[in-house]
């Protein structure tokens, strides 16, 4: 290869201009204003998009626009330069240049790039047109808004100009009419405010209102938001020359925080004087009031109502104190509490008194205040009938005596001829014509609670004692009840018609219990009567009337009624029915009543004769219909003013009743824990469901069943209530395999069918003693039987024999009693029992016998025991199983 240089060849050289990249980021500094005249400088950067020019150099960055102008429509793309014709090979040879021919792939790539460039150019042109249309529409909207704002500004300026003109005319007219001139203000102090207490007499020139506030005033004002806006005065007292308006509306340091805010209203009212806002005026007034009242405020003392338990938050609210202060006081006393903790009344009282408040203690039982024992005015009282309770031992003739007085026959209608309910009747005295109320009580031991209730509501107790029987246990109990109730006693010695009657013996026996009759020098009246022959009944009524006169029984009938529930039951057709003895006031139909935890409205009143009455006065027994549920016997009845008060009282009493029941259950649990583990785990329960006709009978049944319980077996009352046996009672009994007891009640059709279907036993009773005896026998069957040993005889071993197929056999002589085969035996060696078992073999000579008498010799063998020695003693005994009973 020859290295030659062709003429006309060009040499490689660098362009004269060096390629550089201009920065895309432009920096500027702007000042940002804040409230209270604060500002700071902020560096702003603007990044531009790098564009490459046609010659390969980057285009210069566009200068930042001062005002936003719509971008012009993009110019049409410049036509591509015309392609020059390719030089011929002769021309290439003459120029000395050798051009490389493009390959097919390169020509294809260039064609593709040109096509893509054309498509991209069309797309950019379309996007530019859309952007131009959007900018044009936005410009139209902006122009409309500017025109509307300009119109509003002009209208506002016109309104202000009209108001100023009207005001100026009014001032001029007033000056012309009255000839008054305003006093000139005194020269202001250094702070720009007039001196305190200064007075001026020089006339003051009219103040010219300036549309723009001078900067000097803004700089000197210490609190531009709070202090009133004043116009700066000149040295002569006249208005100072207005300062030129500021050239720029930018906020100055110390200016008000509102001057930096640009709103539409401030933009339109830029030439007006800024007035004090309502909020600023209120703040200034409050601050002045606060400075004026430097005297300490007097603490407001409140009367705080403190219940038995109260939370800290509630206590703080009632005292109008902060709960934090209350907790702080508790912490000083060494108690750590939270805001929702409950404290007792004593602690709450200490806190309230510590904070200077007065305390009024209240209790939950305050809802019962005013229900009972309200003192009546003596001028409003009138005499009332006496209430007499007949008490005594069973079968001493109490009910028969009342039947003779009432000319009725109650005894024949009673089950078993015994009284099991407490009854109330009214009898009219044949001589005086006055009414006497009698209350008949049961005499059996199971009805102790009934007798106690009868003694509490009575004025006089008639103690019936049989002349042939004398003083009995229930007679003594009746005497104790009468003394506990502090009521006088009249002794009625009954059955004097019997041949073996001994009234004197009765009087003598009563002396042992501090009951001294008049015939023996005492003050207790005694009357010998005969209920069967109706002997001396008029004398008994006369003694009762005389005793009532001595008691001087009076009450106020014109007041809300008070009374006592003697008996209560659940009647199937009438609902809850309560026998009530009215003691004070008058009970009327429609009254709202409360008795125990039950309330209601009186729907009907039924007298002892079965008649419906509208009202019942003092000492009148009536049946009351209208309770929500049957009350308990012995509850006190009261009439309240409205249902709200009745609900409060019943709610409180129901809560007390639940707490009492819970405490009893807890106490029983603690006693059971104190018992031994054997007794606790070994006790068997006898589940029962008891339904009775009246509350008093149910109470007596439950008391009797509770007394039957022991450490080994006890009656478990699943449910006890007043009324008939329902299907729900059968369902409950099925779940616990219990027995249902019905006392003077029956099961309805559905309950009887369900009991028969599920195999539940229902037992019906009319006499309480039959019920108690049956349950006692059933509970006795749950007791473990007692094992008792019966000694049969003793034998002494003389010699031991070894017999094949049998083993060791003891040759013995029976020393006492008899020895039986199969009986239990003990082997005693040196007075120590070494074996207990059964006698398996008993032979007399070579024959098997059942028993061997004393003095005879025999052979004995034990079951599974062969360690027998000569000289051992054998005890033979029999074990008997004896069934126990309660």
From Swiss-Prot:
Pfam families linked to this entry: EF-G_D2 (PF22042), GTP_EFTU (PF00009), GTP_EFTU_D2 (PF03144), IF-2 (PF11987), IF2_assoc (PF08364), IF2_N (PF04760)
Residue sites binding GTP per the record: 392-399, 440-444, 494-497
Region G2: start-end pairs: 417-421
Compositional bias ranges of the Basic and acidic residues kind: 117-190
CDD domains per record: IF2_eIF5B (cd01887), IF2_mtIF2_II (cd03702), mtIF2_IVc (cd03692)
tr-type G domain boundaries: 383-554
Entry GO terms, CC: cytosol
Residue ranges, annotated region (G5): 530-532
Biased composition (Low complexity): 191-220
Localisation per UniProt entry: Cytoplasm
GO molecular function, a single term: guanosine tetraphosphate binding
Family: Belongs to the TRAFAC class translation factor GTPase superfamily. Classic translation factor GTPase family. IF-2 subfamily.
PANTHER family membership: TR-TYPE G DOMAIN-CONTAINING PROTEIN, TRANSLATION INITIATION FACTOR IF-2-RELATED
Name recorded for this polypeptide: Translation initiation factor IF-2
Species of the source: Rhodopseudomonas palustris (strain HaA2)
